[in-house]
Amino acid sequence: MIVVVDCKDSFVYNLVEYISLFDKVRVVEKESAGLLRKMSFDGVVISPGPGKPDRSLEFVFKMGVPVLGVCLGHQMIAEVFGGKVGRVEPVHGKTSLVEHDGRGIFKGVRNPLRAGRYHSLAVLEPPEGFEVCAKSEDGVVMGLRRGKIHGVQFHPESVLTEDGVRMIRNFVEMCHDG
């Protein structure tokens, strides 16, 4: 089972639908995320949402399961691990070409990838120990990875993103590969 932490974005249930193609999924609101401490699951997706990243979900990264952060979730990863998140030129409902390394969630995904973006904040400095695994054509960090922790600034669940279902399937497979 994959848990989606709902950070109140309108795309949350697109993520849920994609995940449900490959595994059971449960949605837990961010305000109730403490419930995860008592649950059994194979992976966590931290959803997009409005506002600024914070450290409220820091405990999730210590649970030993794969984590995928999307947009705000990606920014939370950077925030929790000491990276820097800040304002960038707003990009809402636009596509960009994203170059990636073809590993992890990007395995088997076309390169460059056309990805849907909806953000005005981004990772300006990645956390130490994380690799930048994807960047947009305008130089914005679009993917971070360290071990079982993965983040993407763009929205794989958007219809604007090519191979979004493939990326989610790759993540679910990682959750079951140990």
Swiss-Prot record:
This is Anthranilate synthase component 2. Keywords: Amino-acid biosynthesis, Aromatic amino acid biosynthesis, Glutamine amidotransferase, Lyase, Tryptophan biosynthesis. One of its GO terms (biological process) is L-tryptophan biosynthetic process. PANTHER family: MULTIFUNCTIONAL TRYPTOPHAN BIOSYNTHESIS PROTEIN, MULTIFUNCTIONAL TRYPTOPHAN BIOSYNTHESIS PROTEIN-RELATED. It comes from Archaeoglobus fulgidus (strain ATCC 49558 / DSM 4304 / JCM 9628 / NBRC 100126 / VC-16). Part of a heterotetrameric complex that catalyzes the two-step biosynthesis of anthranilate, an intermediate in the biosynthesis of L-tryptophan. In the first step, the glutamine-binding beta subunit (TrpG) of anthranilate synthase (AS) provides the glutamine amidotransferase activity which generates ammonia as a substrate that, along with chorismate, is used in the second step, catalyzed by the large alpha subunit of AS (TrpE) to produce anthranilate. In the absence of TrpG, TrpE can synthesize anthranilate directly from chorismate and high concentrations of ammonia. NCBIfam families: trpG_papA (TIGR00566). The gene is trpG. It holds the Pfam family GATase. Pathway: Amino-acid biosynthesis; L-tryptophan biosynthesis; L-tryptophan from chorismate: step 1/5.
